[in-house]
């Protein structure tokens, strides 16, 4: 295996493609690269700058169950704390409250700042900036904030 292996894309099963597309386009500002609605198969490819990194597949009858083995959470990195705060404002405008009541550091004393929330199917998401958390208090002592939301 090549030492240059990197993640290609993440595929998520969703219960309602239209609702999920609206969420990911609005909150994370992802663009729809392709969408398919034929023969009972509904799915879409999303990304940024023309680069694919998220696929949505309408194949689920029920929301995400965090107590089952599998995906813990999906994290998206943005350049600045302001980008994280923009996502928070969009999330709140949709009537959805983030975990921890807003942007927090990954752990006490960390420079990285994150927002933790769920998508319409309950899939746990994180959007973070590598810098900008100086002076913010971590919500969880002795463990990463991303581990227990």
Region spans (language model):
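Core segments of cupin and vicinal oxygen chelate
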Residues: 2, 13-54, 58
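Exposed loop/turn and edge beta-strand positions of beta-sandwich/beta-sheet ligand-binding modules
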Residues: 40, 70, 111
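Short beta-strand/turn micro-motifs at beta-sheet edges
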Residues: 59-64
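Short beta->alpha transition motifs characteristic of CBS
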Residues: 108-109, 127-134
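Vicinal oxygen chelate
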Residues: 14-18, 75-124, 149
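N-terminal beta-strand motif that seeds the catalytic metal site of vicinal oxygen chelate
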Residues: 1-18, 71-74, 131-149
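Short connector loops at helix/strand junctions that flank enzyme active sites
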Residues: 49-51, 68-71
């Amino acid at each position: 295996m090549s030492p240059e292996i990197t993640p290609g894309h993440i595929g998520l099963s969703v219960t309602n493609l239209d609702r999920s597309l609206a969420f990911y386009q609005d909150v994370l500002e992802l663009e729809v690269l392709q969408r398919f609605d034929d023969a009972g198969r509904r799915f879409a490819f999303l990304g940024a700058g023309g680069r694919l990194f998220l696929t949505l597949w309408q194949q689920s009858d029920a929301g995400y169950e965090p107590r089952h083995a599998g995906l813990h959470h999906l994290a998206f990195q943005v350049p600045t704390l302001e980008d994280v705060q923009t996502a928070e404002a969009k999330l709140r405008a949709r009537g959805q409250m983030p975990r921890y009541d807003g942007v927090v550091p990954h752990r006490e004393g960390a420079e990285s700042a994150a927002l933790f929330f769920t998508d319409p199917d309950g899939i746990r998401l994180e959007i973070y900036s590598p810098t900008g958390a100086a002076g913010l208090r971590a919500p969880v002592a002795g463990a990463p904030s991303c581990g227990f939301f």
